[in-house]
Amino acid sequence: MIKYKIIRNKNIKNNQILAISKLKDSFWPYGIKNQKKFLRSNTNINDLHILAYKNKNIVGYVNLKIKLFIKNDNIKKNKFFLFDGFIVDKLFRKVNIGKNIIKICKKRSKSEKIPIFLLCKRSVMPFYKKLNFKIILKKKYHLLNHRYKGLLMQYNLSLKKINLIKIKF
């Protein structure tokens, strides 16, 4: 049976950081030491880690980072969750772990009234679309401190009255 945990970054333990780093390194091979360093230096204390466990092993993971965006040249900054580092162990794919992690993220997004943004390659866009994520057209957003040629998708944000979103990672 798969169990899921949500852990604030300030409460994450070293053994969990190591397990996450090993899982991430199975897909993004930068070395476990670099994965740990990246995880430590690119998260804030209130960011969330969503973990999927099979027995005591982490088999799925995503980091929900709390970031800011601006709508329509307004000065008011709005929070969003950056859906980052999403991975499911190769041996546990096709058993809905990824979908369940996303359901947990969506529930959190709704309860806190904070949208989710994610950057993805076109090849995985259909997966997110099935889970009610919407594409934000390139003309509707500007990444202030990040370059990316893939797609930006969102969940839980009405784009009707938005002409431009400025996003700071």
Q: For each predicted feature, which ranges?
A:
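Conserved N-terminal entry element of GNAT/NAT acetyltransferase domains
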Residues: 1-15, 161-168
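Residue-level detector of beta-propeller blades
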Residues: 6, 58, 135-137
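A conserved beta-strand-loop-helix scaffold within acyl/acetyltransferase catalytic domains
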Residues: 9-12, 17-87
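Conserved acetyl-CoA-binding loop-helix of GNAT-fold acetyltransferases
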Residues: 88, 94-107
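Short glycine/proline-centered loop/turn elements that form peptide/ligand docking sites
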Residues: 98-102, 123-124, 140-147
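Conserved GNAT acetyl-CoA-binding A-motif
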Residues: 108-121
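Conserved catalytic-core motifs of GNAT/GCN5-like acyltransferases
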Residues: 129, 134-152
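Acidic/histidine-enriched, glycine/proline-rich intrinsically disordered or flexible terminal extensions
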Residues: 146-169
